[in-house]
Amino acid sequence: RKQIFLACKTGKRNSQESRLDLENSLRLLKTDYVDLYQLHGMKTKDDFIQATRSDGAMETLVTAREEGKVRYLGFSCHSIEVAKLLIDHFNFDSILFPVNWALILKNDFGPELIKICKDKNIAILALKAMAHKLWDNPSIRKYKNCWYQPLDDTKMINLSVKFTLSQPVVSFLPP
């Protein structure tokens, strides 16, 4: 177990449901702790408000860390605004968000958050390193759980991965 790093997530925003998610993950994984537990899909200010109120999911994360059931706390996010709110209010160990050359060049999405994370020593786990664009026709998407079209050209994939790994990320999740 010490040689494996287990990360789990909860999409629940209240303490009771997020605690059930955690306990279920521990049971299914047959372990008494996970290394990283993440608030998943923090997209809106409402997600932030729900997760951080007195009976919110953050209560579960903090308590679980105190109990030794979780070593590190993190969140996944596609909103710079929400990510900054979370970072300003809690001491997170990691963030999972898109680090992709196209998003940075076209929308300036990422550089500010990368700097904040670097300054606060928050580990960056990169998503969507090989994203190309939204599917033109989502009904014919090749990968059922992938809402964007990944790159399919080997040279572009290599360049995209090289770019993502040139950023201060600790890992990336393909595609």
Language-model segment annotations:
Residues 1-4, 60:
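N-terminal binding-site loop/beta-alpha segment at the start of enzyme catalytic domains
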Residues 18-29, 111-119:
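Short amphipathic alpha-helices and their capping/turn segments at secondary-structure boundaries
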Residues 1, 11-18, 45, 102-107:
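Acidic-and-aromatic substrate-binding clefts and catalytic sites of carbohydrate-active enzymes
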Residues 26-48:
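Active-site groove signature of glycoside hydrolases
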Residues 42-175:
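Beta/alpha (TIM)-barrel catalytic core signal, keyed to glycine-rich beta->alpha loops juxtaposed to Asp/Glu
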Residues 10-13, 77-79:
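Short beta->alpha linker loops
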Residues 3-4, 31-34, 70, 92:
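Local beta-strand N-terminus motif with an aromatic residue
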